[in-house]
Amino acid sequence: MTSKSSPLIFERSREGRYAYSLPISDIKTNSVESLLDDKFIRKNKAEFPEVAELDLVRHYTELSNKNFGVDNGFYPLGSCTMKYNPKINEKVARIPGFSESHPLQDEDQVQGSLEIIYSLQEELKEITGMDEVTLQPAAGAHGEWTALMIFKAYHENNGEGHRDEVIVPDSAHGTNPASASFAGFKSVTVKSNERGEVDIDDLKRVVNENTAAIMLTNPNTLGIFEKNIMEIREIVHNAGGLLYYDGANLNAIMDKVRPGDMGFDAVHLNLHKTFTGPHGGGGPGSGPVGVVKELASYLPKPMVIKDGDTFKYDNDIKNSIGRVKPFYGNFGIYLRAYTYIRTMGATGLKEVSEVAVLNANYIKARLSEHFEIPYKQYCKHEFVLSGVRQKEFGVRTLDMAKRLLDFGVHPPTIYFPLNVEEGMMIEPTETESKETLDYFIDTLISIAEEAKNDPDKVLEAPHTTVIDRLDEATAARKPILKFENLKQEK
């Protein structure tokens, strides 16, 4: 591995340098020893970096120039909906009345903020076909877990606490079985059929008296719509189970069909994906959960409700599973999502889904002669191709993903879902132009040609990035996670 990376801020440090100085305080201060117990006081000086202001500014400016995001390049990361985040969202989120409010302020001082929360709940109820919505969960997996805890409380309250199995398709997001386990359930896998949809016969085999729920994404992770969803609903409901909708792929069906109309009992959404609250870099996210009326009394508290002309928190929720997030979730993301929904309107959201589906099918059609396409039918917002043809020349999907970096394109999701050999999952979203799509397609085709005629160029990629191919085995076995470890290595 060759590195052209910047030195760490600690490596720039020189003793005695500082970025700025403060005036000498004329306020009498107490010693640390007089304020804290001895066990809380450091025995050694903290090793903070010491740099001049100019060095500090240059360091972080240099790092920022090396970042890659939707604002500076195509980001077709399958199942992540890396769409453009409109800048009007940021303007609204920075309105002082919102950005400077505090979650512990009295209700009468934050009526505008509470109205935003209430109004967003109402919008999401309409979009999903659910009867009630909580905005508390902080991310998609958090929303999954919240919904499953609601299911668990519901079954226990109905004397069916023995229901401890959650059915998960073999193409599901990895968070689905993880959330099920975290909520105290066992995961049971249902197979996909030759069309990439849930195998109905296998579903009938795994459903039993212990079934608590099935977790589905529709369209699924292969980008295929589960056309038998009503039959799936009937099978699971007849067995006493509930249907959970993973909202990761809602971008494909807005104003076309609603999860509630498909028979789902609960749904989580990703405001940081579908509704343009920016994501990547660790957050913050937002994973609201909607439920049918039979489950409404189990939602986390408090809920924000409208009482006449005012808005307030409602803690009187009979069977509530309790709080799942301090205060009331990530409010800044609510502002961005609400702005997006109000800007687009129902017609705009419908067009979003139509163009997202069109873009995915356009790419799929143009690449079909150059790559193996395991599922031939029209896809929705994303699709999965396979690199098995290129594997014949010793080039794997990982190598092609690395080569894409040389062309200024973020690689798609690779080796997921697990039921496609050498899989590459591509989601272009609706915000990309035809010119961008064509550039990406032509680039992938050229890489496929390189795999056949000049495989070493692909195998040794990337060639133009700050860091060349990583030694992933050593990185996994001997991770250097802090500066102390780096000093030891050197």
Curated annotation (Swiss-Prot):
Its EC number is 1.4.4.2. One of its GO terms (biological process) is glycine decarboxylation via glycine cleavage system. Its cofactor is pyridoxal 5'-phosphate. Gene3D superfamilies: 6.20.440.10, Aspartate Aminotransferase, domain 1, Type I PLP-dependent aspartate aminotransferase-like (Major domain). Keywords: Oxidoreductase, Pyridoxal phosphate. It is an enzyme of class 1 (oxidoreductase). One of its GO terms (cellular component) is glycine cleavage complex. The modification N6-(pyridoxal phosphate)lysine is found at residue 273. CDD domains: GDC-P. GO terms for molecular function: glycine binding; glycine dehydrogenase (decarboxylating) activity; pyridoxal phosphate binding. The keyword Oxidoreductase applies. It catalyses: N(6)-[(R)-lipoyl]-L-lysyl-[glycine-cleavage complex H protein] + glycine + H(+) = N(6)-[(R)-S(8)-aminomethyldihydrolipoyl]-L-lysyl-[glycine-cleavage complex H protein] + CO2. HAMAP family: GcvPB. Belongs to the GcvP family. C-terminal subunit subfamily. The glycine cleavage system is composed of four proteins: P, T, L and H. In this organism, the P 'protein' is a heterodimer of two subunits. The glycine cleavage system catalyzes the degradation of glycine. The P protein binds the alpha-amino group of glycine through its pyridoxal phosphate cofactor; CO(2) is released and the remaining methylamine moiety is then transferred to the lipoamide cofactor of the H protein. This is Probable glycine dehydrogenase (decarboxylating) subunit 2. The lineage of its organism: Bacteria, Bacillati, Bacillota, Bacilli, Bacillales.
